[in-house]
């Protein structure tokens, strides 16, 4: 989040970072920011994942189909989608162009919701479209959750693998993995990249770690947020269906088209729920 911009928004509206802890508070804050500034509050890199986790937290059960998409008859999943879609339809949030950090750094949005590794790509300065600049004062928070229930978090990452080869090379590959994931070395590695540690011991050492890169305070906030999520949230793996991510790409491309027109139609008086239903129809059309 652009901390400099958020400070002005907070002073004008009373919205604080604590209000972003829940999805309800997040979307409410997004509406208030839009009313105050006329701009979207947040660009989401992976909105379908946010919808999934929110639905699961509400007790949706399994909402995947045999062909690797979504059960559009699952009412809880749909309502989770509609919560996001109503905000999108009014211009309160947007699907990011690809990665939200670019839109945050140009002041097009105040915040971004995406991977922890995005911290690598933030500048120290926000440069607005009119050429004015101010310090980013980057603030990092845990992902919102549903109020009053056990929180979930997404689990995604990069795996290490080795080709089937000679016994000697296989032993060397295993030795490398053990070397790379030793507690201190693992923490040194991930602290430069924004990734989560893979060892319990590395997580335990985060609070006293003193070798974060600049901006140190932002990295400290990131790892404090990751530590909080690890301690309090249940990880959920991402879908692995064949062809799934091609469908997600089609969904996001369609949403980017719709978000160019829906806010103006909402402002002109069209029913927000009806506009949100257009995004649901898009999701339902993907097979």
Model regions and ranges:
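Short, solvent-exposed loop/beta-turn-alpha elements that line the ligand-binding surface or hinge
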Residues: 16-19, 61-79, 130-132, 145-151, ...
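Short helices/loops that flank or line small-molecule/ion binding pockets
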Residues: 28-32, 98-112, 253, 257-260
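Extracytoplasmic/periplasmic substrate-recognition and gating elements
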Residues: 85-92, 129-201
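Paired acidic/hydrophobic, glycine-rich loop segments that form the ligand-binding mouth/hinge
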Residues: 110-115, 120-122
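Conserved C-terminal helix/tail region of periplasmic/extracytoplasmic solute-binding proteins
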Residues: 214, 220, 224-287
């Amino acid at each position: 989040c652009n901390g400099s911009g958020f400070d002005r928004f907070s002073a004008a509206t009373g919205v604080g970072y604590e209000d972003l802890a829940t999805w309800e508070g997040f979307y409410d804050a997004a509406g208030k920011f839009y009313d105050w500034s006329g701009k979207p509050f947040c660009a989401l890199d992976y909105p379908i994942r946010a919808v999934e986790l929110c639905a699961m937290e509400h007790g949706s059960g399994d909402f995947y189909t045999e062909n690797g998409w979504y059960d559009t008859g699952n009412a809880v999943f749909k309502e989770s989608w509609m919560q996001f879609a109503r905000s999108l339809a009014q211009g309160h949030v947007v699907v990011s162009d690809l990665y939200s950090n670019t839109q945050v750094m140009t002041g097009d949005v105040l915040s971004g919701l995406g991977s922890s590794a995005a911290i690598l790509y933030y500048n120290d300065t926000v440069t607005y479209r009119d050429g004015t600049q101010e310090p980013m004062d980057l603030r990092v928070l845990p992902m919102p959750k549903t109020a009053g229930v056990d929180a979930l978090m997404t689990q995604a990452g990069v795996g290490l693998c080795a080709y089937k080869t000679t016994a000697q090379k296989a032993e060397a590959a295993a030795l490398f993995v053990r070397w790379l994931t030793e507690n201190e070395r693992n923490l040194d590695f991930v602290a430069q990249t924004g990734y989560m540690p893979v060892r319990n011991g590395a997580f335990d050492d985060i609070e006293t770690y003193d070798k974060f890169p600049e901006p140190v305070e932002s990295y400290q906030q990131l790892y404090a947020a990751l530590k909080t999520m690890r301690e309090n949230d249940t990880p959920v793996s991402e879908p692995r269906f064949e062809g799934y991510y091609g469908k997600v790409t089609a969904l996001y491309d369609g949403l980017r088209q719709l978000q160019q027109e829906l806010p103006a139609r909402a402002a002109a008086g069209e029913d927000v729920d009806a506009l949100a239903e257009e995004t649901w129809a898009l999701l339902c059309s993907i097979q």
